[in-house]
Structure formats: structure tokens, C-alpha cells
């Protein structure tokens, strides 16, 4: 079984390992032997990777697994782990051995990377970026025939805030002040409460902001972070890299991945009894990998819990635009805290946003920010110092973050086309989510909670005992065994639930809803045929 190599989760994993006798797979371990039913090309692939691993192990180079930072060995990131590595090799082999496989393409359902799967960027955003990057176009008469008037106006305004009017220049370490002003205004419009641009730190996506906060809060294994299980593995990985302890709390699958305050209290008390100083609570809303959207009442309970226990609330809100059901609505934790009357001196709150998700999906542009509230001035100086070490985030990402929080408004030249693009993407995501949800729930032994938000489904698979035993023989987790077999048979890439964490003895996988609509029927057909064949092969 893949384990969370975090001290506080270790006991849970050891319990599960005693039940199932699995070892944690490693990307440096030799690949498992191909299944008897594997095509010859797959056999060649596994053979070549095993030989490569063996030659690596005899290297006399000065850097070895024994000499590198052990914290690096402790962290894992399943979203781009072993199965994805296999898929990438298969994709290369398909170019020259297309007839050797039972599929003609690899379909990546493993990661929230919309544009890699055919989603088009928002035209207004790209027009503004193009004009900012090639500012001389603004002086050309032809530009007014090629670009919308509001994208031209926005580009002028943005360039006025950039040092030297050049996107290749460094900026302030927190990000360009004029762009932070725009983002603060967008937050204020969203929440109905004031936002201060000096609280905003622009980063290369949300991930560096998470790392920055872990670096700030964790000094040893005696410092812990309450993190959900299942969780986005950025959190377990960053906690490991920065030397802290992950304190897991389990989301309740039976109630649609609900967050129970009673479980938070139990895990907090248990950690404290072991001498761990729990510093913060991570909440992902909408959920990744689980796709739930928290009710506002639940959020109030969470805020009150953090206030009472003196915990920093780390609010991962990068999917705030991705809500697909009419009975749920996104509410920021800052809005909830302010609605309860908690101000700067009452609760420490860090909220994360990214240009990679939502309806924009600009993953490669690496834009995002964190809004840091409820910290003393001397601590804020230390946060700024950490930001300064990295000089600044990239300017294109900064511009996109400002555009995401201040898109075209009614009356703007681009407004109608922007709304058509936005609504089209979100409605299509909702349709794809429902189609995949229904398909998964139709499979034998599979249950999938409602897709309320984010970009993922996290179905539970009840595997036959013979399949679990076959996985044990290959020294891999049963859900990873299932996902490898799925990849080898169909070319569809999903991520085992063991990479996100799950209740011991349960098995899941994460599947994105991002392949375009014309690909969904093929995914459903491939998955349905594979699952039936798999269950028939291993039926008890």
C-alpha cells in the first residue's frame, strides 16, 4: 500500500499494512513484472525500465539515496507518480508501435490540467497578456481591428503599473502593487468585506504559497498540521519537506465527504497528547480529490473551532468558481469569519487562489496568490522576507491573477463573448461530471458521491479478494493495481486513492472531469468494458 510517509499518519498506515501486507511503491524501485495478458510492447517497456533501475543502483556518483536529504525521500506526489510515468513511456512507444496496444491514445484523467485536454483559454485574458508582452502593438493602428477595446484599455492600465512597462522586469516581491489593488477590489466585491492589497502575496500558482506557509509554521516533527484525508498530496509532501508532522482528519464518505468537528477535536487532542504542537488546519473547499462543497454552516463551525483552539486556518479555495449543483454555493472562509464578527486580531487566516483552476485553467502560466490576515507586523515581515528570497513571481501570472479577479463587466466590449466562454466551460464541466458520476455508479462494486464542485470524482471500488491478493503478490496497493491494469488495457490514466489517503481497507481512484465532451463516451465505454473484464477475472 502506498503510505503517507508522515509520522502522524504512520500508525494508520501500519495498521492497514498489517491487514494487507503491502509495501510502499517507489518511483526508484524496479517496475513490477507485466501481467500475463500484457501486450508484447508492454513487456518490452517494463523490461527496459527494470534494467534502467538496476544500472542506476550500481552508480558510483557522489549523490545517492543515502546521502540526500531524508525529507525528500519522505515526500510523495501521486498525481505525477508511478502510473503517470508509465503512461508517458507508453505514449512515446505508441508513436512507433501503435498496433501493439489495445488503444490508440493515452487519455490523461490524472491531473487538473484543462488546456492540455483541449480547453481553450479565455480570449480576453490572452489578448491582454499578448498586448502587455508586446507593448509596441498598442501603438499600431491595426491593433484596434484585432483586439477588443477593453483589452487594449486594460493592457495600458496594467503597463502603467509595471516597472519600465516591461513584463520581463522584476517586480515588488509581493507582486505589482497596482495588480494587488485590483485583486483586493475583486475580493471585496466577492465577499462584501474590505480587503487590503498589502495582505496579498502574488505567487507562481498557489503551491509556492502553501510551501511558504509550511516553511513559516513548521520547525520540527513536533509541529503538526491538521490535514484532510483524502487530501491533495501537495500538503503531505510539503509537510514532509519542511520537517513537520501531518495530523490526519478523515472526511466522511457516507455523508458526501463531510467534515465533522468532532473528528477534528479527536485528532487534535490525540496529537497534543503525543507532544505535537498543532499549528494549523488545512481545509480544501471545493474539495480535492473529493469534489464536495462545504455548507456555510459547516464553515462557521470550522472558523469557530480554529478560533477556540488557536489554529491558523489555511483555506485552499482554488476551485471557488467550480460549483456545479444549484443547492450549493461557494463562500470564502474570510467572508464567513468576518460575518461572525472576527477581525484581524481574532483569527489567523490564509486563503489561496490560483489561475490554474476555475473556468480559466491557465496552469502553465503559474499565477496565484495568498491573502494573509490576522498576523502581527513582525511575523508579516518574516513572510515578506521569504517572498523576497524568491525575488518575485512571474509577471504574466501576476497579470492573469488580476484578470481572474477582475474580468470584463457589463458594458465592456468583451463582456458578451467572455460570458459565453465562461458559462460554456462551466456548464460543460457540470455535464461531464454528471455523465462520469452516473457511469461510475453503474459499475459493479463502485460507488461515487455527487460531483458538487472542483474538477474530480473520487469513486470507491470494492475489489474482489482475489484482486487484493494479486496486488499483494506484486507488492502494490490494490487500487494502484487496478489503475495500472486500467491504463494497460485502455490508455486511461487515473490516480489511485492510496496516493491521497483513505480509510484503511477502502480503495478509490481519482478521475478528472476535464477531457472534452467528445472524449467522454470513449472513456465511459473503455472504463465499463475494462471493469467488467477485471471483475470477471478476479471474481471470488
Curated annotation (Swiss-Prot):
Homodimer. The modification N6-(pyridoxal phosphate)lysine is found at residue 357. It comes from Arabidopsis thaliana (Mouse-ear cress). Its EC number is 2.6.1.2, 2.6.1.-. This is Alanine aminotransferase 2, mitochondrial. Expressed in shoots, essentially in leaves and flowers, mostly in vascular tissues. Also detected in stems and roots. Belongs to the class-I pyridoxal-phosphate-dependent aminotransferase family. Alanine aminotransferase subfamily. Coiled coil: none annotated. GO terms for biological process: biosynthetic process; L-alanine catabolic process; response to hypoxia. Residues 11-40 are annotated as: Disordered.
